[in-house]
């Protein structure tokens, strides 16, 4: 049986945490900030944790990380 391959596009965007969760950067942060409030821009900084239902789907793609 062939080896499982890691989905490289996903591997560049997500990091696995020690407890098996996945974190990623926030979306909507590359441009068009003039339409966002200060609060929205502040809350978009940093990383986000993926919810548990989505983690199950992505865990298969990121099995070797």
UniProtKB/Swiss-Prot annotation:
Keywords: Ribonucleoprotein, Ribosomal protein. Gene3D superfamilies: 4.10.410.60. The gene is rpmI. One of its GO terms (biological process) is translation. GO terms for molecular function: structural constituent of ribosome. Residues 1-47 are annotated as: Disordered. Residues 1-16, 31-45 have a biased composition (Basic residues). It holds the Pfam family Ribosomal_L35p. The keyword Ribonucleoprotein applies. It comes from Leuconostoc citreum (strain KM20). Belongs to the bacterial ribosomal protein bL35 family. Signal peptide: none annotated. This is Large ribosomal subunit protein bL35.
